[in-house]
């Protein structure tokens, strides 16, 4: 009995009097038990279910009543497979979700790999672009020479400067000192030429000045050529593979010849 003389859901569906010790009373309430027991009675039969519950221990009866009720409702939806069809559908759903999870993991790993490769490729492109820019500006050979000689001077320093010990600033100072020495030598040559013309008693001042200037220019050109030849031998002994030294010498010779 469910209390106050009300029958249980099974007895209500069977339209019988619910007696004390009814095997269905603890598991089928008066309000909703009738609908649940209707499926059980249609699939298994009330007498078969009562015998099954009576043979089970009291501790196992609640779980058995729930299982029987679920199986009866599944059999009404699928008379052939019952709850097996629902279990199979759940297994298929689990397999589909596992395949999707594996695909997402593989895609994530591939994306990380492509990101690392892209970063490495980008760094290589930037390095190649920087090297190409250095070669275009004339810094490539200088950087290679500094690396082979242990020099740490940056590429932004004078690309055409040379020195015997690998320093860019020292080479620039050597060229500056050489040009200054040539200028001083030309001035001294002009001074001695004019003294010589005055001592010789030249009558025509214009011709004397021209002759003195020509002699001084020729003397200074010879002196500058000797100086450049000496420095060229030093530069060629210290760094034998540079075309910029010859370019600088040709520029200096052109300047002296025009003067």
Swiss-Prot record:
UniProt keyword list: Developmental protein, Nucleus
Keyword Nucleus belongs to the record: yes
Disulfide bonds: none
Gene Ontology molecular function terms on file: protein homodimerization activity
UniProt entry tagged with the keyword Nucleus: yes
Main location: nucleus
Family stated for the protein in its record: Belongs to the LOB domain-containing protein family.
Function: Acts as a positive regulator of adventitious (crown) root formation by promoting its initiation. Acts as a positive regulator of lateral root formation. Regulated by the auxin response factor and transcriptional activator ARF23/ARF1. Involved in auxin-mediated cell dedifferentiation, and may promote the initial cell division in the pericycle cells adjacent to the peripheral vascular cylinder at the base of the stem. May act upstream of the gene regulatory network controlling adventitious root (crown) development.
Assembly and binders: Can form homodimers.
UniProt protein name: LOB domain-containing protein CRL1
Organism: Oryza sativa subsp. japonica (Rice)
């Amino acid at each position: 009995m469910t209390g106050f003389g009300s029958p249980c859901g099974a007895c209500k569906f069977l339209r019988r009097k619910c007696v004390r010790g009814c095997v269905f009373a603890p598991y089928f309430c008066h309000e909703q038990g009738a609908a649940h027991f209707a499926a059980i009675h249609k699939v298994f039969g009330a007498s078969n279910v009562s015998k099954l519950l009576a043979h089970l221990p009291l501790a196992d009866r609640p779980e058995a009543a729930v299982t029987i009720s679920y199986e009866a409702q599944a059999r009404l939806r699928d008379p052939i497979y019952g709850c097996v069809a629902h279990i199979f559908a759940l297994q298929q759903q689990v397999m589909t979700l596992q395949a999707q999870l594996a695909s997402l993991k593989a895609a994530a790993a591939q994306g990380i790999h492509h990101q690392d490769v892209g970063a490495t490729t980008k760094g290589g492109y930037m390095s190649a672009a920087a090297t190409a820019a250095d070669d275009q500006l004339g810094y490539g050979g200088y950087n290679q020479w500094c690396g082979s000689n242990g020099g740490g001077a940056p590429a932004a320093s004078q690309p055409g400067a040379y020195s015997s010990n690998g320093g860019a600033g020292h080479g620039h100072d050597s060229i500056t000192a050489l040009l200054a020495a040539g200028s001083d030598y030309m001035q001294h040559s002009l001074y001695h030429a004019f003294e010589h013309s005055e001592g010789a008693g030249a009558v025509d001042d214009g011709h004397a000045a021209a002759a003195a200037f020509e002699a001084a220019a020729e003397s200074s050109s010879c002196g500058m050529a000797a100086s450049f030849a000496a420095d060229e031998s030093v530069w060629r002994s210290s760094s034998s593979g540079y075309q910029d030294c010859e370019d600088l010498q040709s520029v200096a010779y052109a300047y002296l010849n025009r003067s």
